[in-house]
């Protein structure tokens, strides 16, 4: 009863642990077009705890399968906040490895995974029951294909390419997509044409979520 009063949901993780969360995947999807959510990436347990106390909606946490302890510490510091673990791009070289890596993240506390995988790998993970957030627009580790670390979607051809990628993630079963450094008008148009939650990072206010770094939210950086 106290949990419900706090607006939390009782859940069981994919790893079989009981817990409480501010959002489930269904809750997040229900907010599309209703409320713009705030997402952040903490780099320390202290930042994660502060973000939860401040009421940040969701978090992304870096997950290293060879050293899971930092991600586990983040989960412990913010036990009630929906948390996607960002998995390394090159840690999975097949659909089977993608599912295995996703399961490793979910077992230690992830509510979802965030990845730079192809639709084929995303489909394998979602078919295994893992909520997945893809990555479109400027994907830094794939930036050689888009001309380097710069804005993407500045031409009609690029804009259509970004939209196509997002629709491929949608078809693969993803629930969300991080959209990085594309024109604000393009993200606004895409958000209306996909069922995915769009998380804007440097792409203006047209997304369903605003992805902000914890240092900026918490004021850890001196003003310019």
Task: Locate the predicted segments by residue.
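Alpha/beta enzyme core
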Residues: 2-224
